Amino acid sequence: MTKITSDDVRKVATLARLNLPEDLIDTYTSQLEKILGYVAQLEEVDTEDIPPTSRAVEVTNVLREDIIQETDIREDLINLAPNREGDFFRVPKILSE
């Protein structure tokens, strides 16, 4: 594994548009080095016979079948409006011509 340098951290910070304080560069260099070490360990794990997954535990949706039902509440809903004009809701004008 390639060693991470302070210059690498500065370059990544610049690419990510992060303004890192100079006194924290060494801290971030050390932390990034450890993270990449963990990734290197994961690369050593044999996953040849393991199928790709997106979750550790399988999740399934509980779906119901859509059933089309006739309803006759249109007039009731329109009557709930504070102001109506025929089959439409009447609302205050918000745009000028």
UniProtKB/Swiss-Prot annotation:
**Nucleotide-binding among keywords:** yes
UniProt xrefs under InterPro entries? Asp/Glu-ADT_sf_sub_c (IPR036113), GatC (IPR003837)
Q: What class of enzyme is it?
A: ligase
Q: Which GO terms describe its molecular function?
A: asparaginyl-tRNA synthase (glutamine-hydrolyzing) activity; ATP binding; glutaminyl-tRNA synthase (glutamine-hydrolyzing) activity
Q: Which GO annotations describe the biological process of this protein?
A: glutaminyl-tRNAGln biosynthesis via transamidation; regulation of translational fidelity; translation
Which reaction(s) does the protein catalyse, per the Swiss-Prot or TrEMBL entry?
L-glutamyl-tRNA(Gln) + L-glutamine + ATP + H2O = L-glutaminyl-tRNA(Gln) + L-glutamate + ADP + phosphate + H(+); L-aspartyl-tRNA(Asn) + L-glutamine + ATP + H2O = L-asparaginyl-tRNA(Asn) + L-glutamate + ADP + phosphate + 2 H(+)
Question: What Enzyme Commission number does this protein have?
Answer: 6.3.5.-
Pfam families annotated for this entry? Answer: GatC (PF02686)
Domain of life, per lineage: Bacteria
Question: What keywords tag this UniProt record?
Answer: ATP-binding, Ligase, Nucleotide-binding, Protein biosynthesis
**Transport found in the keyword field:** no
Q: How does it assemble?
A: Heterotrimer of A, B and C subunits.
Family that this chain belongs to: Belongs to the GatC family.
Q: What does this protein do?
A: Allows the formation of correctly charged Asn-tRNA(Asn) or Gln-tRNA(Gln) through the transamidation of misacylated Asp-tRNA(Asn) or Glu-tRNA(Gln) in organisms which lack either or both of asparaginyl-tRNA or glutaminyl-tRNA synthetases. The reaction takes place in the presence of glutamine and ATP through an activated phospho-Asp-tRNA(Asn) or phospho-Glu-tRNA(Gln).
Could you tell me what this protein is called?
A: Aspartyl/glutamyl-tRNA(Asn/Gln) amidotransferase subunit C
Q: Where does this protein come from, organism-wise?
A: Prochlorococcus marinus (strain MIT 9211)
Gene giving rise to this polypeptide: gatC
